[in-house]
Amino acid sequence: MLYLTKIRNAESEFTGNEQKIADFLRARVSELKSVSSRQMAKQLGISQSSIVKFAQKLGAQGFTELRMALIGEYSASREKTNATALHVHSSITSDDSLEVIARKLNREKEMALEQTCALFDYARLQKIIEVISKAPFIQITGLGGSALVGRDLSFKLMKIGYRVACEADTHVQATVSQALKKGDVQIAISYSGSKKEIVLCAEAARKQGATVIAITSLADSPLRRLAHFTLDTVSGETEWRSSSMSTRTAQNSVTDLLFVGLVQHQ
């Protein structure tokens, strides 16, 4: 379930007590084998029920399930670190050889793919495929690296017969958004979900009655709140200088899966 990733990406939604619990779990994950919910509640000055509710909010049945899962994740992470310490212990530096850089990049992309697939909602994807398959027109929006992902998806969709607009110019994106109609679909790609231009386009699309599908991170964001559907991507973007590469890898895996699903649906 990758609960450590869930905790990191849901931080902006935590209450004060939930943040205390999250900080404790991350700082003391190596000691969780000997920690009970009662001990934890006493140490943090909160109720046991708050800890149970926190675990359930993350998708676990209770604290015991969350604790055991975190212990397992920590152990697996330690094993990977010991086996591949050369390319996962730090970001790329100016002293790295090309071989080391290649290993770091590959590992980063592997982690982005593993985490994205592990947290993916495939039932939601099926609903999205059904919505897109009926759309008379599709607009794809994105900036920077996300725009490249959008352009790639637009070419794929056009090849199988969909009417698609994917413009790099933000003014054109805004104009197209304002011309969408009910039944049309806008696919907004933004890892942060907070790019002003993309959010404005999503607002315009919703106002026109179009369905907004966001390909974004798990973190709460204006785009995530605006979207009718979300396709979640995960990458260690705050930990690596090459973060946009892992983000793009995660986004491409989602758009490729969406494309293949649409091909099957035809």
Curated annotation (Swiss-Prot):
Listed InterPro entries: Homeodomain-like_sf, HTH_RpiR, RpiR-like, RpiR-like_SIS, SIS_dom, SIS_dom_sf, Tscrpt_reg_HTH_MurR, WH-like_DNA-bd_sf
Portion annotated as DNA-binding: 37-56
Gene Ontology molecular function: any one: DNA-binding transcription factor activity
Ranges for domain SIS: 128-266
Record's keyword terms, sorted: Carbohydrate metabolism, DNA-binding, Repressor, Transcription, Transcription regulation
PROSITE patterns in alphabetical order: HTH_RPIR (PS51071), SIS (PS51464)
S-S bonds: none
Superkingdom of the organism of origin: Bacteria
UniProt cross-references to Pfam families, sorted A to Z: HTH_6, SIS
Boundaries of every HTH rpiR-type domain copy: 1-77
Pathway the protein acts in: Amino-sugar metabolism; N-acetylmuramate degradation [regulation]
Annotated GO biological process: carbohydrate derivative metabolic process; N-acetylmuramic acid catabolic process; negative regulation of DNA-templated transcription; regulation of carbohydrate catabolic process
PANTHER family: GLUCOKINASE, HTH-TYPE TRANSCRIPTIONAL REGULATOR MURR
Subunit organization: Homotetramer.
Function: Represses the expression of the murPQ operon involved in the uptake and degradation of N-acetylmuramic acid (MurNAc). Binds to two adjacent inverted repeats within the operator region. MurNAc 6-phosphate, the substrate of MurQ, is the specific inducer that weakens binding of MurR to the operator.
Record-given protein name: HTH-type transcriptional regulator MurR
UniProt organism field: Shigella flexneri
Gene: murR
